[in-house]
């Protein structure tokens, strides 16, 4: 990884000590679990109870999967849960222009014909029906020198000559964008997607491996015995086409890692995090079966910005070894910019758990090992990694035994452990003492590999900790645990996107409201570049900006805290900022989040709807 210091701060005590921030003396008048905000910034007689301020942090791990998967029961199936009214449908234009006429100078042939097409072929009528353009220059045109949205662009005035009826193109900027790696990668071609949909895709690696994995199912209680039986029957035994030593090298030592995050961990967010110092990013969780069905929504998830690679991982969830093997092969062949393939064994969402995916795999180690074996054999030179929790039940940790089994199979390049059980969720702090115990197991395994002639040449298994990292002190305390190579940051990087800048500076950065707004503006530009500058793209960008602001508004400026360090699980009383903008950025009212989006995306249309996810269980119980 680039820009990673050779020595950690703890190895240079004098220097690190000098850089530590001044810690105010502790005051006991704050109730347990309440953020210690200075008295002059606390709002008297608040209109919002403390308990009702925030969305559920479990949603960052499962996001809209619960809504999407739960909606497969037909049109009239009742919506369940606290947020029955959460409707994410976005608005469309009153008059829809046929896509064949996006560029009036170079029209394409409409496959339906002008008379039969349900969209308009009258350019003048379309332009006159459009709402007033958004002020400023088109973010897409500014970034890449042309605008694929053409006449549909909401900033059309900035790249359209009304007199000549021509769209403008900046050829110099087109070349600059390529030189600056300003483009997206891992896009599956339409013909490959069609072959998946028609079940005609060729899985040369997975098809060899699946019969071998099937043979292991016969005796899951004793995998070693099953392997011996399979070897005796040469007709069913297949050697894995790739071994761990033949994979790309994966070095996560001291890397600044952003956790896989569903919904909020989208491409614009990850791209923003790369500009703020992140070394490693991950896709949103993709489900293996929809990938194999060639669905557009699922294949949108492995897409990445070119600046994310190297250091970009694709995360998948599955419950079947055949699906895992095939999905791994498809990603290897169709997504050319992937540094690692991560198996999600930590998602706590009930729906996936009931389907045997996510954290449910921790309860079925034999199935988990088969899945990892299938992925490893079918993913070409892409190393396979796994993300787990301490266990599925509270006060019953199982990760130690599971990690020992995973290591013995030698199928993964890295293991990430979230210091919580599935049942515990976010009501208590992560158990870093248990993370340390598991780190010792991985460290011992790596030491044994050094003494083993057969395994000596293979890469050591990286171990990454995860849970409640919100400050540079949290980060360094974690990476200085023996055996912990690095830390994966989730909520901390959503609430405070500049966390890695603080890690680099080894101090708290009291960002002004203006600086924070600039970051949000950068996100808006990246969002428009990704989703498009037409009405639909702007609606998507606005919706995901609101999801993002649903986390960033939780940041409490360090300058208004009575003592440090801040903690993720502390609930703040209602507070006001040092200026109006800071107060607005900390607002818990989603209508204020929409106002913030309007600073960059223009006025929200009357049909735009956004309802935040349901209340949170993310805070310590007082």
Curated annotation (Swiss-Prot):
Top-level EC class as recorded in UniProt: oxidoreductase
Annotated spans, Disordered: 1-92
Residues spanning the membrane: none
Reactions mediated catalytically: 5,6-dihydrouridine(47) in tRNA + NAD(+) = uridine(47) in tRNA + NADH + H(+); 5,6-dihydrouridine(47) in tRNA + NADP(+) = uridine(47) in tRNA + NADPH + H(+); a 5,6-dihydrouridine in mRNA + NAD(+) = a uridine in mRNA + NADH + H(+); a 5,6-dihydrouridine in mRNA + NADP(+) = a uridine in mRNA + NADPH + H(+)
Active-site residues (renumbered): 347 (proton donor)
Residues the entry annotates as binding FMN: 260-262, 315, 387, 418, 466-468, 490-491
Stretches annotated zinc finger (C3H1-type): 93-124, 137-160
The protein's required cofactors: FMN
Keyword flag Membrane: no
Ranges annotated as biased composition (Basic and acidic residues): 1-31, 50-72
Entry keyword annotation includes NADP: yes
Pfam families per UniProt: Dus (PF01207)
Compartmental location: Cytoplasm; Nucleus
A molecular function (GO) term: tRNA-dihydrouridine47 synthase activity
Keywords: Cytoplasm, Flavoprotein, FMN, Metal-binding, mRNA processing, NAD, NADP, Nucleus, Oxidoreductase, Repeat, tRNA processing, Zinc, Zinc-finger
Any one cellular-component term (Gene Ontology): nuclear periphery
Biased composition (Basic residues): 74-83
Main location class: cytoplasm
Function recorded in the entry: Catalyzes the synthesis of dihydrouridine, a modified base found in the D-loop of most tRNAs. Specifically modifies U47 in cytoplasmic tRNAs. Catalyzes the synthesis of dihydrouridine in some mRNAs, thereby affecting their translation.
Family affiliation: Belongs to the Dus family. Dus3 subfamily.
Protein name: tRNA-dihydrouridine(47) synthase [NAD(P)(+)]
Organism: Debaryomyces hansenii (strain ATCC 36239 / CBS 767 / BCRC 21394 / JCM 1990 / NBRC 0083 / IGC 2968)
């Amino acid at each position: 990884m680039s820009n990673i210091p050779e020595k950690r701060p703890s190895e240079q005590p004098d220097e690190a000590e000098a850089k530590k921030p001044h810690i105010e003396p502790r005051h006991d008048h704050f109730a347990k679990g309440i953020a210690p905000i200075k008295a002059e910034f606390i709002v008297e007689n608040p209109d919002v109870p403390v308990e009702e301020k925030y969305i559920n942090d479990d949603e960052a791990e499962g996001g809209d999967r619960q809504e999407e998967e739960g909606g497969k029961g037909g049109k009239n199936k009742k919506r369940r849960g606290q947020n029955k009214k959460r409707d994410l449908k976005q608005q469309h234009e009153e008059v829809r222009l046929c896509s064949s006429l996006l560029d009036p100078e170079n029209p394409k042939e409409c496959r339906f014909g002008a008379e039969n097409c349900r969209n308009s072929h009258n350019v003048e009528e379309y332009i006159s029906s459009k709402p007033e353009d958004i002020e400023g220059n088109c973010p897409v045109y500014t970034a890449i020198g042309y605008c694929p949205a053409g006449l549909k662009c909401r900033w059309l005035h900035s790249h359209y000559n009304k007199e000549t009826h021509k769209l403008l193109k900046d050829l110099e900027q087109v070349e600059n964008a390529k030189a600056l790696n300003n483009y997206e990668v891992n896009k599956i071609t339409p013909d490959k997607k069609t072959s998946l949909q028609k079940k005609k895709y060729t899985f040369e690696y997975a098809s060899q491996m699946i019969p071998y994995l099937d043979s292991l199912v016969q005796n899951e209680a004793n995998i070693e015995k099953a392997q011996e039986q399979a070897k005796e029957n040469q007709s069913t035994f297949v050697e894995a086409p790739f071994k761990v030593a033949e994979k790309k090298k994966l070095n996560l030592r001291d890397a600044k890692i952003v956790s896989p995050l569903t919904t909020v961990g989208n491409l614009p967010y990850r791209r923003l995090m790369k500009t703020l110092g992140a070394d490693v990013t991950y896709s949103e969780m993709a489900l293996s079966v929809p990938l194999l069905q060639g669905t557009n929504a699922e294949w949108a998830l492995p897409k990445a910005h070119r600046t994310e690679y190297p250091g970009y991982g694709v995360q998948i969830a599955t419950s079947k070894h055949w699906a895992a093997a095939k999905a791994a092969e498809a990603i290897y062949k169709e997504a050319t910019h992937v540094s690692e393939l991560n198996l999600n064994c930590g998602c706590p969402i009930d729906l996936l758990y009931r389907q045997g995916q996510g954290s449910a795999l921790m309860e079925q180690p034999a199935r988990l090992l088969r899945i990892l074996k299938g992925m490893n054999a079918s993913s070409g030179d892409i190393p396979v990694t796994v993300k787990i929790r301490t266990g599925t039940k509270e006060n019953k940790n199982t990760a130690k035994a599971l990690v020992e089994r995973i290591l013995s199979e030698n199928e993964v390049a890295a293991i990430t452990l979230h210091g919580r059980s599935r049942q515990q969720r976010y009501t208590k702090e992560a158990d870093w003492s248990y993370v340390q115990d598991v780190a010792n197991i991985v460290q011992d395994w790596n030491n044994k590999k050094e003494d083993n002639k057969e395994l000596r040449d293979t890469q050591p298994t990286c171990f990454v900790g995860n849970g409640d990292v919100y400050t540079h002190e949290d980060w360094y305390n974690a990476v200085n645990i023996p055996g912990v190579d690095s830390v994966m940051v989730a909520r901390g990087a959503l609430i405070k996107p500049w966390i890695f800048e603080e890690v680099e500076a080894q101090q708290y950065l009291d960002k002004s409201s203006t600086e924070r707004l600039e970051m949000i503006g950068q996100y808006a530009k990246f969002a428009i570049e990704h989703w498009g500058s037409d009405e639909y793209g702007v609606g998507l960008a606005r919706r995901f900006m609101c999801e993002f602001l649903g986390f960033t508004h939780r940041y409490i400026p360090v300058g208004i805290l009575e003592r440090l360090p801040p903690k993720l699980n502390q609930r703040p009383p209602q507070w006001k900022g040092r200026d109006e903008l800071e107060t607005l950025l900390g607002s818990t009212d989603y209508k204020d989040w929409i106002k913030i989006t309007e600073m960059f995306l223009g006025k929200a249309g009357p049909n735009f709807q956004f309802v935040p996810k349901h209340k949170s269980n993310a805070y310590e119980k007082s």
